[in-house]
């Protein structure tokens, strides 16, 4: 499929056009028509009904939903993607409420600041959806994408969306969406690209505290940061004056290795080695909440169960339904930029960290190898990292 850039899609939306938004192939893997309520024209919903044929919904911010008393459709939401449907509505000025014109009227009234809860009949023929406050950075769904796109065009936080179906009633995917795009001359973007766009556009960390931290390996300055969209807490250890070409270690949290000195992995040994190096040569350790390469502590323990049955660290993740590595280094890049650092010497054996930082504008001037001894317990793990994951060990 050929995707357009986010800026061109925003321009199209602001001109009243409809675009196609495609989600992750591991999620619904479908395309929705998306329009911004404030900019859409009288033909938008008619086009969706005739050409896309899916359910026409109206994503809105939580503020709009609360102001208009749009309560959840059900108390116990069992939708597999957690889509926040409210009770369906028609505006009181409609008749049956089902015509494209009347659904357009209802959608427009959702963003009218003079509208009140009593102005909408329930149930109706338009289905509001409530977006997460943090948008696609909290949930990578079409609901959040529509509201984020509206905000990025400068409009009120509301949109209209509709799934695209093929002529035979199946959901349009892949080349079907490409043909639909070409037939109707529409812009097409991915939610993943929208996520990256927002990450580059908006600050994602907040500085919270700085203290002196004496350790077994020397005394460091410890900075505390909070990720604004996930509420994750990140700590950074520094030694010496902060400068360009700083020696930097990105360390993914490993409770079992860092705290309990597990020999299943080499994480604890790498952290200690890096602290000794930074204490001697100066630099920075960014300690990231990425337990189990991003799958979390309990899932990592589940992966260990599979490893005890003969899986390796990669195939265990895949068997649990995860990619081999879910980590993203945007937060790390944001922290480096907070310190005005764009060029670093990276303490790492993992090539994916190099690429992960480069895509966010960080230049890797030099790689510093982290050498730790192998144990009888982590031999297979180390071999898998080297052979399957390309680690330089």
From Swiss-Prot:
Co-factor note (free text): Binds 2 divalent metal cations per subunit. Magnesium or manganese. Binds 1 zinc ion per subunit.
UniProt-annotated stretches for the region DHBP synthase: 1-200
Domain of life: Bacteria
Binding site for Mg(2+) 2: 28, 142
EC number: 4.1.99.12, 3.5.4.25
Record-listed Mg(2+) 1 binding positions: 28
Database matches in Gene3D superfamilies: DHBP synthase, GTP cyclohydrolase II
Region (GTP cyclohydrolase II) residue spans: 201-393
HAMAP family for the chain: RibA, RibB, RibBA
Record-given protein name: Riboflavin biosynthesis protein RibBA
Organism this protein belongs to: Staphylococcus aureus (strain MRSA252)
């Amino acid at each position: 499929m050929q995707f357009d850039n986010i800026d061109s899609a925003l321009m199209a939306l602001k001109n009243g056009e409809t675009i196609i938004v495609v989600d992750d192939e591991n999620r619904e893997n479908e395309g929705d028509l998306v329009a911004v309520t404030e900019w859409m024209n009288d033909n938008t919903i008619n086009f969706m009904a005739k050409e896309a044929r899916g359910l026409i919904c109206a994503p809105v911010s939580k503020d709009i939903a609360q102001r208009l008393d749009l309560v959840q459709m059900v108390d116990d939401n069992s939708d597999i993607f957690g889509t926040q449907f409210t009770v369906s509505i028609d505006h009181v000025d409609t008749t049956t409420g089902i015509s494209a014109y009347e659904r357009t009227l209802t959608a427009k009234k959702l963003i009218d600041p003079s509208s009140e809860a009593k102005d909408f009949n329930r149930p109706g023929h338009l289905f509001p959806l409530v977006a997460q406050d943090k948008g696609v950075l909290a949930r990578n769904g079409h609901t959040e994408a529509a509201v984020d796109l509206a905000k990025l065009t400068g409009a009120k936080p509301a949109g209209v969306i509709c799934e695209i179906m093929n002529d035979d009633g199946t959901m349009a995917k892949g080349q079907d969406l490409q043909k639909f795009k070409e037939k109707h001359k529409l812009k097409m973007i991915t939610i993943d690209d929208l996520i990256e766009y927002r990450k580059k556009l908006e600050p994602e960390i907040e500085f919270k505290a700085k203290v002196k931290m004496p350790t077994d390996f020397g005394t460091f300055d410890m900075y505390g940061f909070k990720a604004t969209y996930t509420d994750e807490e990140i700590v950074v250890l520094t030694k010496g004056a902060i400068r360009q070409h700083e020696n930097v270690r990105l360390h993914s949290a490993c409770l079992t290795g860092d705290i309990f000195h597990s020999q299943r992995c080499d994480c604890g040994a790498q952290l200690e080695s890096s602290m000794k190096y930074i204490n001697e040569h100066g630099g920075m350790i960014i300690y990231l909440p990425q337990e189990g390469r991003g799958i979390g502590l309990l899932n990592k323990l589940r992966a260990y169960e599979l490893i005890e049955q003969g899986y390796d660290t990669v195939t265990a993740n895949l068997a649990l339904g995860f990619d081999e590595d879910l980590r993203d280094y945007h937060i790390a890049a944001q922290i480096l930029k907070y310190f005005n650092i764009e060029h670093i010497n990276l303490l790492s054996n993992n090539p994916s960290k190099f690429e992960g930082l480069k895509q966010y504008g960080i230049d890797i001037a030099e790689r510093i190898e982290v050498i730790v001894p192998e144990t009888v317990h982590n031999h297979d793990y180390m071999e898998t990292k080297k052979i399957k994951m390309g680690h330089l060990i």
